[in-house]
Structure formats: structure tokens, C-alpha cells
């Protein structure tokens, strides 16, 4: 087929016939041109079979050729129409030759009929070659080395009739005949090349090439290698299963150990709680703890060791003879200290805890029987009061009394509104005493001296009483309350300069309620600095 014939074929079959099924068929072939040349991609058994099936399906469509209710007559081979190239020219009828763009539906019969006219071929041999090629394709899935054989088949003159000058229909039948001829010659060349050398693999995957022409030694090697692989895989699976079982057993043992530890912790916690409960219940009635808390053995003001015997100057039993509430540093026991001081850790180096306690004279009016027990809390300390003459300003009156004088009448503010009957029977007679008279502003400050044994207060004496002081005896029994003879200034080492220096209020005799002294009855006497 020349270039002119190729152009004519393209114009007639590809572009001039829109209803023809051939453009669809020829357009789906990957890289296959109509007229094979030296640069044309070669045909393989797979593409040849797909081409044959496509032609068979498209030409056997019953609806396409008979749309115009016209059935062309069948074409037959003419006996004398050989052109010398081994290809018979098929004469066409008048209808098919004169009508442009109509394809004869019986053209599908031409490949099988043309093959019978080829030199040295037969239709039975062609069918057998197709079956053999198909079987060869099933056996060798990776054999794609038919390019050389196909190209040589075209060069050997199997398609010599392609250069015949003729009509478009006759040229197309020649092309189909050449395709079948190339398909028939492919089988013999493929068998020769497969026997000569194993083709290279062009596909991926683990599946090796079919061992159709493999030597027995190679087959034995492959079998041995396959058996070894199977054994290695089985050993690997067994080792993995063994490791899994071992780890599972170890996990079970650890879980059991954890459960045992949890139970042991719970048991120990219960025992601890029970012991703590017993300790709390016994703490209130434990005599040893009470003894350790209340007494610590001392020797010359030092805490003695635990095993030191009390002898000589370290007489711990002499504390029972001293009920004067004084802690002697040379003998006796120190009460109220913590029992932790009497520990073995401090026995080698006792602490020098020598308390400095002031000498406190006893109160003459207090009986020793009123003191609390030695085990109880210590009684409150009592201090003697100095004479009030050192604290009072010289106003010309007796100032040694601690009692506050009581006014015989109410203040002037009350006397103007309410008539008050005094003991003398006179109405609104202001009986002036020393507290109601105006007093001078003091210009000196009395400082209290330290406590001296001579500065004792005798509550039963009468030389420092004022005329209006209250009684200190009730039916011969002295009043011994904590507030008797005390005020705030007597508890300090001197006046603060801001507190009144008058004596404390003492309950008076049966007086009128309006005659009782009030905070506003007299001006406060402040000491100026």
C-alpha cells in the first residue's frame, strides 16, 4: 500500500463514513496503524486476538447493516482472479461498487476465505496455529518478546500483497489477510525463541516464570529451596507462638504477685489501725505516761540521766516537804516539764536548765490549807502592796488606806433634783468630805520600790483605815478573796502615769442607792510625767 492508497483509505473509511463501525475499531487499537511498515508497532498474540474479536462483534451486529431494509448479496471468491502475488482479488457487485460509503457486511468472511488462497498455507493449519498460539500464551504469561519475530514475518514477504493497486475495499481485505498471515507465522517463531533463551521479565510480583523448559537440576534446586523456606517459616511461627505464650505466663505470674501484695497491704493497714485504736484507748489511763509528763529527776538544777540514783544532794523525795509553791533548783522535782527531756538520748549531755525564780513571801492572811494539790495547776502568784502613803499626794488627810472613801451624800447633781434624807435627818445638806473638796494638781511622781519584806500589808490593822472604809472582817473571819487589798497598780513595778492612783472600790455598808460612788462622782486623778 503506497502513500496515496493510504490517504484514500483514510478519507473513505475514517472520515467519510460516520455510520461505519470501523473508525471505532481502528481508534481503540493502541499504536496499531492500518498499513504495517518498518516503523509500525508489531502485533502480539494478545492484540491479534482482541482485533479478531472486535471485528467479529462489530460485523455481526444484526441491526446495523439492515437499517435501510437492504441486504447485499454475499460475495464469493472468483476462480481466476489471482494477480500473481498470492492474494485473490475479490470482485464487488455493482451496488457496492457504485454506492460510496456503504460497507459490505459479509466482509467478515474474507479473512478465512483469503487464507485458503495463500501459498503454502491452509485453513486448517491456520486454525491450528491460532489454537497453538493461544495455548502458548496461557503457558508463558510473561513472554512479550514477539517484536522481533513479528517484524521479521513482515519482512519475509508474508504481506507482499500490500502493495497491490486496487480499490479501497480490495485493499482492506488484503490488510486483513496480512494480519492472519502474520498471526500464523508468530507461533513458530515464538517457540524457537522460547527454546533458545528465556525472555526477560517485564512485570512485577513474586511469581516466577513458568518452568516449561527448565532443566531437572534447576527444578530440584527450586524444590529444595522451597522446602527450606517452608521449614524456616514454620520455625519462625513456632518461635513467635512460644514467645507469646511465655510472655502471657509471665504476665499472669506478675498479676498474681500484685494481688498478693495488695492483700498484704490491706492486712497490714488493718493491723496498724487496730494498734492505733488501742494506743488511743490506753493513753488516757496509762500511769507511766502520766508520771513521765509530771516529773523529771533533777540534780543541782540539771536534768539527771535516767539511771542516776537520787542520793545526797539529789534528793528527789524532799519535794513533798516543800509545799510553798517554790521550785528549788538544788532538790526536788520540776513539775510540768515534758517527758521527752527525760530521755536516754540526752543522758550523756544533760541540758543546763537552771530556772531563776524570785523569792516570794507568803501572805500572812492566807492559810496553807487552801493551796491546791501538787499535781494540779500552780496557784496564782500574790505580790505584797507597798504603803499607800507613797502613792497618794499630800492633801492633809490620812492617805494610807487602800479603801476608797464613800461619800455620805450623793453628788450635787442629784441633790438638786431629789431630796435625800441623811442619817442626821437634814434635807439637801451637802456633807463635804475630803473627796468632794477641790484638790491640788500633783507635781511629783511616786515610784514604787522593789518588794521588801517590811512592806507587808496587814489587812487587820486599823492605823491606815479611813473613816468610811469598808470592813475587812466578817464576824471575826478575815476576808480572803483574791481581790482583797489588790488593785491594778499593785501588780506592776510602778505607775504607768495614765492610771488613777485611788484605791479600789470596796462594798460599803447599807447605803442609799444614790449615795453609791460613780465614776463621775470625783475627777480622775492622773499622774503627770
Curated annotation (Swiss-Prot):
Residues 219-282 form the bZIP domain. Residues 376-387 have a biased composition (Pro residues). One of its GO terms (biological process) is embryo development ending in birth or egg hatching. Residues 247-275 are annotated as: Leucine-zipper. Its main location: nucleus. Residues 118-134, 340-350 have a biased composition (Polar residues). GO terms for molecular function: DNA binding; DNA-binding transcription factor activity, RNA polymerase II-specific; RNA polymerase II cis-regulatory region sequence-specific DNA binding. Residues 221-240 are annotated as: Basic motif. Developmentally regulated transcription factor AP-1 binds and recognizes the enhancer DNA sequence: 5'-TGA[CG]TCA-3'. May play a role in the function or determination of a particular subset of cells in the developing embryo. Is able to carry out its function either independently of or in conjunction with Jra. Homodimer. Heterodimer with Jra. The kay-Jra heterodimer binds more stably to the AP-1 site than either of the two proteins alone. This is Transcription factor kayak.
Amino acid at each position: 500500500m503506497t502513500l496515496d492508497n493510504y490517504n484514500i483509505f483514510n478519507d473513505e473509511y475514517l472520515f467519510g463514513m460516520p455510520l461505519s463501525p470501523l473508525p471505532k475499531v481502528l481508534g481503540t487499537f493502541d499504536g496499531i496503524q492500518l498499513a504495517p511498515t518498518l516503523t509500525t508497532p508489531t502485533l502480539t498474540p494478545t492484540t491479534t486476538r482482541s482485533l479478531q474479536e472486535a471485528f467479529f462483534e462489530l460485523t455481526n451486529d444484526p441491526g446495523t447493516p439492515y437499517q435501510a431494509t437492504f441486504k447485499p448479496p454475499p460475495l464469493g471468491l472468483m476462480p481466476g482472479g489471482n494477480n500473481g502475488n498470492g492474494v485473490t482479488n475479490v470482485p464487488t457487485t455493482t451496488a457496492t461498487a457504485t454506492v460510496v460509503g456503504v460497507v459490505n457486511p459479509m466482509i467478515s468472511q474474507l479473512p478465512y476465505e483469503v487464507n485458503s488462497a495463500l501459498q503454502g498455507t491452509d485453513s486448517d493449519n491456520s486454525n491450528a496455529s491460532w489454537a497453538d498460539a493461544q495455548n502458548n500464551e496461557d503457558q508463558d504469561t510473561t513472554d512479550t518478546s514477539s517484536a522481533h519475530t513479528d517484524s521479521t514475518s513482515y519482512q519475509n514477504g508474508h504481506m507482499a500483497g500490500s502493495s497491490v493497486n486496487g480499490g479501497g475495499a480490495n485493499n482492506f481485505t488484503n490488510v486483513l489477510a496480512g494480519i492472519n498471515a502474520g498471526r500464523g507465522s508468530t507461533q513458530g517463531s515464538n517457540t524457537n525463541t522460547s527454546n533458545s533463551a528465556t525472555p526477560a521479565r517485564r512485570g512485577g510480583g513474586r511469581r516466577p516464570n513458568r518452568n516449561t523448559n527448565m532443566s531437572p537440576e534447576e527444578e530440584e534446586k527450586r524444590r529444595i529451596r522451597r522446602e527450606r523456606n517452608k521449614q524456616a517459616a514454620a520455625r519462625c511461627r513456632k518461635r513467635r507462638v512460644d514467645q507469646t505464650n511465655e510472655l502471657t505466663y509471665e504476665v499472669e505470674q506478675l498479676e498474681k504477685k500484685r494481688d498478693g501484695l495488695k492483700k498484704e497491704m490491706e492486712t497490714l493497714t488493718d493491723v496498724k489501725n487496730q494498734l492505733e485504736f488501742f494506743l488511743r484507748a490506753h493513753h488516757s489511763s496509762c500511769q507511766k505516761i502520766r508520771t513521765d509528763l509530771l516529773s523529771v529527776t533533777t540534780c543541782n538544777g540539771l536534768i539527771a540521766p535516767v539511771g542516776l540514783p537520787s542520793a545526797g544532794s539529789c534528793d528527789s523525795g524532799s519535794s513533798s516537804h516543800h509545799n510553798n509553791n517554790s521550785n528549788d533548783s538544788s532538790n526536788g522535782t520540776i513539775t510540768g516539764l515534758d517527758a521527752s527531756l527525760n530521755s536516754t538520748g540526752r543522758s550523756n549531755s544533760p541540758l543546763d536548765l537552771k530556772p531563776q525564780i524570785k523569792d516570794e513571801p507568803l501572805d500572812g492572811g492566807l492559810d496553807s490549807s487552801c493551796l491546791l494539790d501538787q499535781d494540779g495547776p500552780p496557784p496564782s502568784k500574790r505580790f505584797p502592796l507597798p504603803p499607800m502613803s507613797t502613792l497618794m499626794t499630800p492633801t492633809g488627810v490620812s492617805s494610807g488606806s487602800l479603801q476608797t472613801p464613800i461619800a455620805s451624800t450623793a453628788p450635787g447633781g442629784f441633790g438638786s433634783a431629789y431630796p435625800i434624807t441623811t442619817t442626821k435627818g437634814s434635807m439637801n445638806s451637802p456633807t463635804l468630805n475630803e473627796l468632794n473638796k477641790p484638790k491640788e494638781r500633783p507635781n511629783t511622781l511616786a515610784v514604787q520600790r522593789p518588794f521588801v519584806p517590811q512592806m507587808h500589808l496587814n489587812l487587820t490593822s486599823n492605823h491606815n483605815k479611813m473613816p468610811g472604809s469598808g470592813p475587812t472582817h466578817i464576824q471575826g473571819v478575815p476576808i480572803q478573796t483574791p481581790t482583797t487589798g489588790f488593785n491594778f497598780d499593785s501588780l506592776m513595778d510602778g505607775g504607768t502615769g495614765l492610771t488613777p492612783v485611788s484605791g479600789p472600790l470596796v462594798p460599803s455598808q447599807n447605803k442609799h442607792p444614790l449615795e453609791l460612788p460613780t465614776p463621775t462622782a470625783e475627777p480622775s486623778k492622773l499622774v503627770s510625767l
